A protein has these predicted regions:
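Long, small/polar-residue-biased beta-strand-and-loop interaction regions
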Residues: 1-168
């Protein structure tokens, strides 16, 4: 039987509250939850320095078990910047095995890299061998950084969060 893998956003203390965001997408905002619309929780442009969204802790979860296993989880962007020089999305480029409470200060979860350079030619591996229902991968942690040079108004451009895995 084919597996069903969903993308979970993990919020609250130790990133323990999980919400399936496969259909609604990953939202980077000023509150730590999976349901508030981004327009209701914007990131304010700082007068100086940098403002941060809450970290968004993500992991893959198996809801229908595969015949054997799902492995080789990878994530990547299309390489499109939100506002070059004014805002960027960062992502961990190495394993994050344990959840912590998301913060809205600079993330220390794993080695941070600019998500825009993590394209199809430079995908980020996410560890996990999922064999049964409720198995989960390790974490992917993304965060929006907004600099004082950002322009006023709503950012209407989105950045695709792509992922793949092998089922065998």
């Amino acid at each position: 039987m084919a597996a069903t893998i969903v993308l979970m956003k993990c919020t609250s203390a130790t990133a323990a509250e999980e919400t399936d965001v496969t259909a609604v997408g990953v939202r980077l905002k000023s509150v730590d939850d999976a349901t508030t619309a981004p327009a209701s929780a914007p990131i304010t442009i700082p007068a100086a320095d940098t403002a941060y969204s809450y970290e968004t802790w993500l992991r893959f979860k198996c809801t229908v078990a595969p015949d054997n296993q799902c492995t080789n989880f990878q994530v990547w962007s299309l390489g499109t910047a939100i506002q070059t020089g004014a805002a960027k999305i960062t992502i961990n480029s190495d394993a994050v095995t344990a959840g912590v409470t998301p913060v809205n200060t600079v993330s220390s979860a794993g080695t941070r890299t600019d998500f825009v350079v993590s394209t199809a030619g430079a995908k980020i591996a996410v560890a996990g061998t999922l064999t049964s229902a409720d198995d989960e991968s390790e974490f992917v942690v993304v965060q929006l950084e907004v600099y004082s040079s950002a322009t006023q108004g709503n950012v209407t451009q989105s950045n695709e969060f792509n992922y793949s895995y092998d089922e065998n």
